């Protein structure tokens, strides 16, 4: 299209959209945007082949002086301008609306086109139906506003065992000889490949009956097709139990691969008259080891199942049972799995313990020895990785809940191999995460409500003093003088990489350059001779005492990010007043490492909010990356809302909320 033609199309569409609110299909299109994509290809879930309730939305029917058309099977990239180019040559278009998802605004794959004249609508169906639109043949039919008419099965037939090459147009051409067709649809998968079944909806019941009588059992593209009256999913499910009780079709598997179809039939012939038999084969004509046998009477099928199931034939036990559809079989397997899962949960409820922070030297046998004094242990296991190395946690299962409770009371926080154990009742990961998220969310909401009432966010966490390290610049906490030189975040090393300690380097005049955060006595360095060993030891002791006063411990790796299992031990050995600072340092560095809270104020505020949790909850956050990210995002959003409200108050001249929580 030229630029002038494109502008002309856009102007025409804008003019149409001005009147779209009064057009017959406008209301339907608007309502349809709130629905899910209705182009469902599930034959068993649609009472009509192509114009299901979801697919049609609330579009209007044919008005007295206008025609509303449904256009389906559209490529998601098709928009109103594309459809206008195709439908406008037929006649004057009243409105066009591509139905979109209310949230994502993505096309649902169908649209409504309204003409001013009924004749134009009829002409569009005749000339444009199955016309390729951006690589996909579109499907056009009259829009039906009445949902009862859409869901009616009158005139609706079902066709199965279609050749994959048969599409909507081919099916329409085949069945149009028996009467006026309202809609045709061949079911397809997500890739657009035929599922080998489809539907044809006639205007009258007589035309549908004529098609069933004429085409059922005929060959279409060398395939014998089945044609019958469409039965809705609801009606089929209501008759399912009756079908189970009177089945005639049986499924056989684990058949000897050398078995021929003739031998297969001879195996089942003694039980009654067989109407059809099928042995599945591969592309080379070799048996796949399973097949189906359909008897004329239910009694014959039941007798074959009773006598041949688990019977050994040619050294193999065959399975013989009632043939099931995939959906029914899947549902039964889900029920069996759920029953086993619930039984397992009830069996181990209150007796299975989760133990973490285990030393790497503790294996399953050692774990059982530690817990043996508290009762009878039915099983114990330390979880290991692919290399056989302990993951630092395991499970111990007792015979009674009383024994498990006693073990929790005695062993939780007990030091084993220099580490405090965490012992609690075992929970599924999804349940544990859900509970923890609910607890943290509730506390965050309470903290934010209290902060709002007090006029500000929770107190800011002041980042720790960073001791002199090569190539490292500390982040500027609020209230500190800006640190000169490169951006601190640009200079930060990777997580968990310690920095070698460094003495102050001499300045231009031979005087030592002060190192940020280093005690003054360590800065008296002439750059030539080290101090005597005794004086160095004394200074190291002084430095260690100052570090401990600030909540810093020498057994903690430089650079932070202590593994969670070691951090728990560090917390247990630290004074009560220093525990929050240790956790705060870990949280602060983790928050800065995300790259989303580069401002020191933001990192400090978010750290302060997350420090309001219990120590164990903070350890869980640091141990679970996904859980940490979820709660970090919540805190970040809360901080941004606070900053936005503060900015709005400043713009309007209103006093900003106090930051002193």
UniProtKB/Swiss-Prot annotation:
Residue ranges, compositional bias (Polar residues): 1-11, 523-532
Highest taxon above the source species: Eukaryota
Pfam families registered for this protein in UniProt: MLLE (PF00658), RRM_1 (PF00076)
Annotated localization: Cytoplasm; Nucleus
Feature: compositional bias, Low complexity: 20-51, 533-549
Residue ranges, annotated region (Disordered): 1-61, 473-563
Listed Pro residues bias regions: 501-511
GO-annotated biological processes: mRNA 3'-end processing; mRNA transport; nuclear-transcribed mRNA poly(A) tail shortening; regulation of nuclear-transcribed mRNA poly(A) tail shortening; regulation of translational initiation
A molecular-function term among this protein's GO annotations: promoter-specific chromatin binding
Cited InterPro entries: Nucleotide-bd_a/b_plait_sf, PABP-dom, PABP_1234, PABP_HYD_C, PABP_RRM1, RBD_domain_sf, RRM2_I_PABPs, RRM_dom
Keyword Chloroplast: no
Domain called PABC: residue spans: 563-644
Keyword entries, A-Z: Cytoplasm, mRNA processing, mRNA transport, Nucleus, Repeat, RNA-binding, Translation regulation, Transport
Task performed by this protein: Binds the poly(A) tail of mRNA. Appears to be an important mediator of the multiple roles of the poly(A) tail in mRNA biogenesis, stability and translation. In the nucleus, involved in both mRNA cleavage and polyadenylation. Is also required for efficient mRNA export to the cytoplasm. Acts in concert with a poly(A)-specific nuclease (PAN) to affect poly(A) tail shortening, which may occur concomitantly with either nucleocytoplasmic mRNA transport or translational initiation.
The family this protein is said to belong to: Belongs to the polyadenylate-binding protein type-1 family.
Protein name: Polyadenylate-binding protein, cytoplasmic and nuclear
Organism field: Lodderomyces elongisporus (strain ATCC 11503 / CBS 2605 / JCM 1781 / NBRC 1676 / NRRL YB-4239)
């Amino acid at each position: 299209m030229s630029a002038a033609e494109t502008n002309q199309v856009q102007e025409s569409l804008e003019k149409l959209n001005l009147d779209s609110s009064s057009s017959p299909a406008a209301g339907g299109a608007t309502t349809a945007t709130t629905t899910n994509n209705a182009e469902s290809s599930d034959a068993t879930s649609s009472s009509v082949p192509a114009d299901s309730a979801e697919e049609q939305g609330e579009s209007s029917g044919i008005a007295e002086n206008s025609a509303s058309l449904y256009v389906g099977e559209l490529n998601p990239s098709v928009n109103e301008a594309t459809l206008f180019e195709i439908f406008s040559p037929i006649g004057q278009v009243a409105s066009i609306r591509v139905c979109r998802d209310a949230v994502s605004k993505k096309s649902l794959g169908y649209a409504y086109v309204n003409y001013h004249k009924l004749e134009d609508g009829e002409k569009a169906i005749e000339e444009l139906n199955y016309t390729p639109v951006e690589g996909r043949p579109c499907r056009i039919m009259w829009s039906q506003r009445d949902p009862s008419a859409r869901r009616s099965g009158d005139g609706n037939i079902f066709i199965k065992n279609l050749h994959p090459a048969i599409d909507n147009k081919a099916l329409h051409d085949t069945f149009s000889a028996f009467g006026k067709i309202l809609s045709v649809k061949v079911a397809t998968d997500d890739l657009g490949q035929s599922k080998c079944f489809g539907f044809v909806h006639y205007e009258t019941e007589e035309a549908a009956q004529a098609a069933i009588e004429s085409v059922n059992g005929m060959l279409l593209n060398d395939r014998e097709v089945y044609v019958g009256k469409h039965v809705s999913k609801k009606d089929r499910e209501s008759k399912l139990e009756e079908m189970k009780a009177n089945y005639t079709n049986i499924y056989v598997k684990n058949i000897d691969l050398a078995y021929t179809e003739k031998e297969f039939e001879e195996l089942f012939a003694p039980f009654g008259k067989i109407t059809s038999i099928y042995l599945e084969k591969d592309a080379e004509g070799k048996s796949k080891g399973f097949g189906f046998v359909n008897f004329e009477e239910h009694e014959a099928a039941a007798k074959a199942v009773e006598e041949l199931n688990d019977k050994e034939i040619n050294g193999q036990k065959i399975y013989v049972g009632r043939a099931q559809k995939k959906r029914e079989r899947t549902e039964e397997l889900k029920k069996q799995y759920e029953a086993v899962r619930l039984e397992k949960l009830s069996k181990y409820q209150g007796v299975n313990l989760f133990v973490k922070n285990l030393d790497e030297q503790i294996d399953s046998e050692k774990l059982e020895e530690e817990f043996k004094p508290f009762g009878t242990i039915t099983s114990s296991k330390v979880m290991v990785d692919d290399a056989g190395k302990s993951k630092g946690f395991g499970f111990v299962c007792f015979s009674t809940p009383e024994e498990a409770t006693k073990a929790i009371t005695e062993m939780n926080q007990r030091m084993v191999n220099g580490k405090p154990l965490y012992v609690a009742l075992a929970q599924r990961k999804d349940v544990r995460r859900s509970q923890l998220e609910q607890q943290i969310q509730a506390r965050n909401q309470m903290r934010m409500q209290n902060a709002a009432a007090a006029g500000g966010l929770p107190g800011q966490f002041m980042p720790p003093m960073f001791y002199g390290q090569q190539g490292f610049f500390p982040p500027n906490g609020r209230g500190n003088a800006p640190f000169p030189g490169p951006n601190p975040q640009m200079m930060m090393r990777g997580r968990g990489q310690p920095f070698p300690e460094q003495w102050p380097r001499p300045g231009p005049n031979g005087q030592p350059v002060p190192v940020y955060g280093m005690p003054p006595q360590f800065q008296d360095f002439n750059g030539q001779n080290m101090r005597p060993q005794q004086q160095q030891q004394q200074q190291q002791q002084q430095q260690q005492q100052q570090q401990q006063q600030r909540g810093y411990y020498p057994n903690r790796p430089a650079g932070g990010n202590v593994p969670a299992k070691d951090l728990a031990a560090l917390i247990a050995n630290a004074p009560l007043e220093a525990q929050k600072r240790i956790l705060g340092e870990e949280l602060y560095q983790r928050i800065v490492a995300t790259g989303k809270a580069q401002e020191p104020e933001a990192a400090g505020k978010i750290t302060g909010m997350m420090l309001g949790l219990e120590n164990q909850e903070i350890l869980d956050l640091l141990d679970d990356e996904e859980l940490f990210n979820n709660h970090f995002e919540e805190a970040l959003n809360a901080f941004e809302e606070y900053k936005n409200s503060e900015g709005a108050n400043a713009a309007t001249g209103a006093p900003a909320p106090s930051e002193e929580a």
